[in-house]
Amino acid sequence: MTGIQALERIAPTKPMQPGQVERREFEYERHGTLSLIANFDVVSGQVVSPSLGPTRTEADFAVHIGRTIDLDPEGVWLFVVDQLNTHQSETLVRLVAERCGLAVELGEKGKSGVLRSMATRAAFLSDPTHRIQFVYLPKHTSWLNQVEMWFGILVRRVLKRGNFPSLEALHARILEFIEYFNKTAKPFRWTYTGRPLVS
């Protein structure tokens, strides 16, 4: 989940010429932001069920997860997420309980039961007996989350040198890139061998 600004350069970019580097205006006009919530399928290397919208609230994340689960309503789902509070929300707990057909008393947020705290909600969401399970990465390990690597690719290939005169242009360009990326997608291959680092 990430926020993306629709930035339009004030002056047009001047392309490279012999003996001259490309010249890009550093001043820009901001046309608003979009929030991208995406899933990265580690087996196929594809971006699955992306959601683009103006906000990234707990309701937005729960709707996104619901749409993703709708791709295979009876399937087993494993979501790797960071420690963000929207990934441990009451709305998400209620969605998982409903979709898994769990008839348990969830309690009241901030007071009792599963909904009492973020820790109790995270424990419920990460229960391996549920067919929809969340795995929470430890803090400061975003490099383990493969969707974060994909966000880096999106920044380098689309956003860094992009010029977006409107939110609609940004929205369309991101979806075009995802479609293009998925056509040639391959899973990321880890190259670190696991040897201890030496100083």
Each model region followed by its residue ranges:
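Extended, low-complexity cationic-aromatic segments
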Residues: 1-66, 195-198
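Short secondary-structure boundary/capping segments
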Residues: 11-14, 93-97
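Short catalytic/ligand-binding loop motif for oxyanion handling, primarily in non-cytosolic enzymes
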Residues: 5-7, 86-90, 143-146, 197-199
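A generic secondary-structure signal
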Residues: 67-71
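Acidic/histidine-rich, metal-coordinating catalytic segments
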Residues: 75-87, 110-112
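C-terminal anion-handling pockets and recognition modules
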Residues: 130-136, 140-141, 148-199
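RNase H-like polynucleotidyl transferase catalytic core
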Residues: 23-28, 99-146, 163-164
